[in-house]
A protein has these predicted regions:
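Peripheral, non-AAA+ core regions of ATP-driven protein-machinery
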Residues: 2-5, 9-12, 16-79, 86-94, ...
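Conserved RecA-like ASCE P-loop NTPase motor core of nucleic-acid helicases/translocases
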Residues: 119-123
């Protein structure tokens, strides 16, 4: 039986604590904590022990459950989520406004529905006519297996989900829903967590297993808004990353109980919706002849896949006291560090030069293995000497200018050889060069040695 207990709730943010205070510790507002009586659903450990029987077992005797995965028509989505949507799983998708969360989920709804799954799309932010207008634009022919419900009531959503016997449920977004049994305002931490708990219960019901995908808002710092508890509740956390001015969208799993984390799916935002990038090389690498300064190529690891990345740099004379350092694809601190190494270890004087770098396709530089390519592209622009477009650079560069080896260098070199590159500059490492018949591998000690070799002609 549920017990009653006294608590104090912030009427501004919904924070609950056992003792009164003048200031809410969560939102910082004064005089907002009010006393209320709430139900304590937790029972004593003695009562819990009567509800079910359980005992410790030997680990080697535990049987593995086989996850039933639901494949979509989007290989990039299935890759990011670990091979397909697990039937009794709860996933949350977060992204900045305008990144394409609702578009992606509507496209997935159509894909699953065409394969015979009953899909319930519950929106707490848009009307049914708004969803229909977008569906007509990006889906075209709408399957009879897609159900739409526009409501903020989790109680009503539960009724309709059960009535329509939905296999896959999409909630857009979880922060807009509420349960009638709680007095907290819509969007408060309590309502959000309890609505998420309701989704978990519906998904993992033994009588009818369902897959849930919830949308979660993202705050200004690029993290999912709300309590961390929400991330702990769900099985999978997906982040759709991309700037509104760029077409590129990266779908990354930051948590996955049913597969590897860090897997990445690549999409391009077009007028007809999100389009899979099937061949990343064509998307990220510009087709050009040798003879253009300021360009260098490397390979970067995103999840389990290797992506070619082209770095473009522009070095120009500055007539201001403080030269510009601009790097949309790279953190400014990292760019300044690499410029300092170039100046001190390679004799490339950039103290009065503007330096601008960019990765083609809008790809963000997340790996140190691209350091060498960035520095070579800057040197190429400064020296007004081009780099051969069949040459690649893979190495982390230390503060001493020394080239350091990068993880999985063998697989990177194999991929580059497959793509038709002829020469690769890397740090000193123990590899058998005979394994690469069509790729010349040049092991170098430091950045000065690389610059001397590349631009000696």
């Amino acid at each position: 039986m549920a017990k009653l207990k006294r608590a104090f709730e912030c009427k501004n943010c919904g924070h609950i604590q056992n003792v009164w205070a003048g200031q809410c510790p969560d939102c910082g507002k004064w005089g907002t904590l009010i006393e209320k009586t709430i139900k304590n659903e937790r029972t004593s450990s003695k009562e819990n022990s009567l509800d079910f029987e359980n005992e410790a077992r030997l680990l080697k005797e535990v049987k593995l459950d086989e996850f039933e995965r639901i494949k979509s028509s989007f290989d990039e989505f299935d890759r990011a989520i670990g091979g397909g949507l697990v039937r009794d799983s709860v996933s949350i998708l977060t992204a900045r406004p305008g990144a394409g969360k609702s578009t992606l989920l509507l496209q997935l709804s159509s894909s699953y529905a065409k394969d015979g799954f009953k899909v319930m799309y519950v929106s707490g932010e848009e009307s049914e006519s708004q969803i229909k207008a977008r569906a007509d634009r990006i889906i075209g022919e709408i399957s009879k297996n897609i159900w739409i419900l526009s409501t903020n009531s989790m109680d009503l959503a539960e009724i309709e989900i059960k009535k329509k016997d939905a296999d896959i449920v999409i909630l857009d977004s979880i922060q807009t829903f509420f349960l009638n049994e709680f007095d907290n305002k819509q969007g408060s931490p309590t309502q959000t967590i309890e609505c998420a708990n309701k989704c978990v219960d519906l998904a993992k019901n033994p009588e009818k297993k369902r897959a849930f995908i919830m949308v979660g808002h993202m705050n200004k710092s690029g993290e999912m808004a709300g309590l961390r508890t929400l991330e702990h509740l769900v099985d999978t956390v997906l982040v759709l990353d991309g700037e509104s001015e760029d077409d590129l969208r990266l779908l990354t799993s930051t948590k996955n109980r049913f597969g590897p984390t860090g897997e990445v799916g690549l999409f391009s935002m077009q007028e007809e919706g999100l389009i899979e990038i099937i061949n990343p090389s064509e998307y990220f690498i510009t087709e050009r002849d040798s003879g253009i300064e300021g360009s260098a190529i490397s390979v970067m690891k995103e999840g389990s896949r290797l992506l070619e990345i082209e770095i473009e740099s522009l070095v120009s004379k500055s007539f201001m006291p403080y030269p510009q350092r601009i790097g949309d694809s790279l953190r400014k601190d990292d760019l300044n560090t690499l410029i300092s190494i170039l100046q001190e270890r390679a004799g490339i004087n950039l103290f009065d030069e503007n330096v601008i770098i960019k990765a083609t396709g809008g790809l963000k530089i997340r790996e140190q293995s691209v350091n060498l390519a960035i520095m070579i592209s800057i040197a190429s622009s400064y020296l007004k000497k081009p780099v051969d477009n069949k040459t690649v650079f893979i190495a982390e560069v230390g503060l001493t200018g020394e080239l350091k080896k990068v993880p999985q260098i063998k697989s990177r070199l194999k991929e580059l050889e497959r793509l038709g590159y002829k020469k690769a500059y890397i740090g000193k490492c123990s590899i058998d060069k005979k394994e690469y018949k069509n790729l010349e591998i040049k092991e170098m000690k430091n950045i000065k040695e690389v610059i001397s070799d590349v631009f000696s002609k």
